[in-house]
Curated annotation (Swiss-Prot):
Gene behind this protein: nuoN
Keyword field: Cell inner membrane, Cell membrane, Membrane, NAD, Quinone, Translocase, Transmembrane, Transmembrane helix, Transport, Ubiquinone
Protein family per UniProt: Belongs to the complex I subunit 2 family.
EC number(s) per entry: 7.1.1.-
CC terms in the record's Gene Ontology section: plasma membrane
Matches recorded under InterPro entries: NADH-Q_OxRdtase_suN/2, ND/Mrp_TM
Organism encoding this protein: Beijerinckia indica subsp. indica (strain ATCC 9039 / DSM 1715 / NCIMB 8712)
The protein, known as: NADH-quinone oxidoreductase subunit N
């Protein structure tokens, strides 16, 4: 049994969120509707405390709970990103949810529950812990997707996500059972030992199903079909959350399981990851070109970006993992900044989502147009912004691993994808002005400015960031 001081030292963020959820449920049950506003503030406070415990807490590595949970530099890095994504999504959505009269006290609780599942998922070192974390994350997401019950599109989005999510969970569970049957253990290190020097066809089949289940959570091709409809139909703060935190958790556990459990069959899983990466980059680049709704465009953009991130994982090296970590951190900043701008798209108190509504924004809301243009240039990978260095990291790792065709395809897809990002900049700066947007709330303006500055300054002062990704990647090997 793990001693209590060790548990407190290495699983404190999870304990804070778990205890906080119970406390918030109790407050909500007692105070009812009167607790709607304070609940969000309390949830933000809990997420902030969890971030501080990770940043300021112990830096040693420990395995807890009979080998099913690990606290290492890799996990801490990804957990900080997930918590930041959840915290900013909650902050950005508070005014929107109140305006739409859906600011129920259950919303921040569901965000916290989903985030707790993500933290468990990132630290999982066994198939059972992986499945428990994944389901805790997913069950809350199903409800959040359909949180706007009076909106038909939101209800449709929630139903689609639930049905396809249940299918993907079944595939993952079937893959886990195959792996357990052929390896004789559910622990990642035990699986690696069982596969040492031997390749079992049954394990490879299990890995395919396991990867399919995780690919659904990452919204990569061919398990992406839910993404555009859910992103468009769900409330915009929910879409911002979907586009950030769950993807980080899913790609984190994918990296952990491939590097630690299946290192012995790297050529086999490398082919799977390369296949998913190429399809995701291609679809994300080409399918977004014809989109007119900016939330659907961001859905295809996220599919493409996950494909680019998987280029680093396909390399299967420490440099590749470092590239993925850097890519996901930069992707998080760009995504949150873009959704802060999307949430600010309101005309006479009504939300608008069409790209044409951004016409002439530079003349009506110049500062908003400037920072949104920075996000678009960075998402397109234009140097010297952070998005360029994100892609450079993963393509460099692919070249070092002699995956030249993958790197070339990635560069070509990035070039094609730049078109629809630059089209938004063109609409904002060169088209005749559409009706002016309402003044953004101070919170959304602050998020847009901070993320914009981060994208600009990351290329100037990369030292601490690169060092953090290096330490995190090294701890996985």
């Amino acid at each position: 049994m793990t001693p209590l001081p060790v548990v407190l030292a290495h699983a404190l963020p999870e304990l804070i969120l778990a205890g906080g959820v119970l406390l918030l449920i109790l407050i909500g049950a007692i105070r009812g509707k009167d607790s709607d506003g304070p609940m969000t503030e309390l949830a933000v406070g809990l997420l902030g405390i969890a971030i501080l415990t990770l940043v300021l807490g112990t830096k040693t590595q420990a395995v807890l709970f009979d080998g099913s949970f690990i606290d290492d530099a890799f996990g801490r890095f990804m957990k900080v990103l997930v918590l930041i994504g959840s915290l900013v999504s909650l902050i950005m959505g508070q005014t929107y949810l109140a305006r739409e009269k859906i600011d129920k006290f259950e919303f921040p609780i569901l965000i916290l529950l989903s985030t707790l599942g993500m933290l468990m998922l990132i630290s999982a070192t066994g198939l059972i812990a992986l499945y428990l974390g994944l389901e805790l994350m997913s069950l809350a997401l199903y409800v959040i997707a359909a949180f706007h019950r009076d909106d038909v599109k939101a209800s449709e989005a929630g139903l689609k996500y639930f049905v396809l999510g249940a299918l993907s969970s079944g595939m993952l569970l079937y893959g886990a059972s195959l792996i357990y049957g052929f390896a004789g253990t559910v622990n990642f290190t035990g699986i690696a030992t069982a596969l040492h020097g031997e390749t079992s066809l049954g394990v490879v089949f299990g890995l395919v199903f396991l990867t399919a289940g995780l690919a659904f959570k990452m919204s990569t091709v061919p398990f992406h079909m839910w993404t555009p409809d859910v992103y468009e139909g769900a409330p915009t703060p929910v879409t911002a959350f979907f586009a950030s935190a769950p993807k980080l958790a899913a790609i984190a556990i994918t990296m952990r399981i491939m590097i630690t459990a299946f290192a012995g069959i790297k050529p086999q899983w490398q082919q799977i990851i390369v296949f998913i990466s190429i399809l995701s980059m291609a679809l994300g680049s080409f399918a977004a070109i014809g989109q007119t709704n900016i939330k659907r465009l961001m859905a295809y953009s996220s599919i493409g970006h996950m494909g680019f991130a998987l280029v680093g994982l396909a390399a299967g090296t420490e440099t590749g993992i470092q590239g993925v970590l850097a890519y996901m951190a930069i992707y998080l900043v760009m995504t949150l900044g873009t959704f802060a701008a999307i949430l600010s798209m309101r005309v006479n108190g009504v939300n608008v989502e069409q790209i044409s509504d951004l016409a002439g924004l530079a003349r009506t809301r110049g500062s908003m147009a400037f920072f949104l243009a920075i996000m678009m240039f960075s998402l397109a990978g234009i140097p010297p912004l952070a998005g360029f260095f994100a892609k450079w990291y993963v393509f460099n790792a692919a070249i070092q691993a002699h995956l030249y065709p993958l790197a070339v395809i990635g560069v070509l897809c990035s070039t094609v994808g730049a078109y629809y990002y630059l089209r938004i900049v063109k609409v904002m700066y060169f088209d005749d002005p559409a009706p002016a947007f309402d003044r953004p709330t101070p919170t959304l303006a602050a998020v847009l400015i901070v993320t914009g500055l981060a994208v600009l300054l990351l290329c100037v002062y990369p030292g601490s960031f690169v060092e953090a990704t290096t330490v995190a990647a090294r701890s996985l090997f």
